[in-house]
Curated annotation (Swiss-Prot):
It comes from Olea europaea (Common olive). This is Thaumatin-like protein. Disulfide bonds join C33-C225, C74-C84, C89-C95, C140-C214, C145-C197, C153-C163, C167-C176, C177-C184. Keywords: Allergen, Disulfide bond, Hydrolase, Pathogenesis-related protein, Plant defense, Secreted, Signal. Residues 1-24 form the signal peptide. The keyword Signal applies. It is found in: Secreted. Expressed in fruits.
Length: 226
């Protein structure tokens, strides 16, 4: 290789890699529902979004086990304390942890091996709001879970404002995969979710059809009621 001739290319490649690993990813969170959604993010906090409003958060590279979700039928006081019917996070407007099921999740891990982000929509914590999770440019797949799951929810999974995942209700290995890899598989109740939202996790070990990748450095859009 002629090093001097290829130096500009090498510098450009280094700059792209450096940017992906050192710059936060931006998440544009949008409420297109006809009702108010109290958006939540871990990390990130939380904010009330009326119809048509949006909220931008920046997430540091290398962040893992992160999620964004919506809360419904909330009531907070001037100090940001209260409660929500679904997705509540310890009674706080600005969440400091995960939400209480049921809640539809946009999950992600940024800047993982091979310069990839791992992204998914999950119904493992149940379903409360239709959700889209997509890149802001066409660099990877658009994920959507937009079925009338609350209205069609099986009776044993129904709860005010949402539809529980069977793991939440029964808390057994059959539904929660608590005995480790390969210890559980699809069930009739998990298939209820999968048939309506093929892109989304329906049980904890649903990785082959539910976990997707995007290039590190991608920015994202999360839409309630796409």
């Amino acid at each position: 290789m002629n090093f001097s001739k290829n130096l500009p290319l090498l510098v450009s490649l280094w700059a792209i890699t450096f940017f992906a690993y050192t710059h936060a990813a931006t998440f544009d969170i949008v409420n297109q529902c006809t009702y108010t959604v109290w958006a939540a993010a871990s990390p990130g906090g939380g904010r009330r979004l009326d119809q048509g409003q949006s909220w931008n958060i920046n997430v540091a590279p290398g962040t893992t086990q992160a999620r964004i979700w919506g809360r419904t039928n909330c009531n907070f006081d001037a100090n940001g304390r209260g409660q929500c019917e679904t997705g509540d996070c310890n009674g706080l407007l600005e969440c400091q942890g995960y939400g209480r099921p049921p809640n539809t999740l946009a999950e992600f891990a940024l800047n993982q091996p091979n310069n990839l982000d791992f992204v998914d929509i999950s119904n493992v914590d149940g379903f409360n709001i239709p959700l889209e999770f997509s890149p802001t440019t066409n660099v990877c797949r658009r994920l959507v879970c937009n079925a009338p799951i609350v209205q069609q929810c099986p009776s044993e999974l129904r709860t005010p404002g949402g539809c529980n995942n069977p793991c939440t209700v029964f808390n057994t290995n059959e539904y929660c995969c608590t005995n480790g890899p390969g210890s559980c598989g699809p069930t009739p109740l998990s298939r209820f979710f999968k048939e309506r939202c093929p892109d989304a996790y329906s049980y904890p070990q649903d990785d082959p059809t539910s976990l997707f990748t995007c290039p590190a450095g991608t920015n994202y859009r999360v839409v309630f009621c796409p």
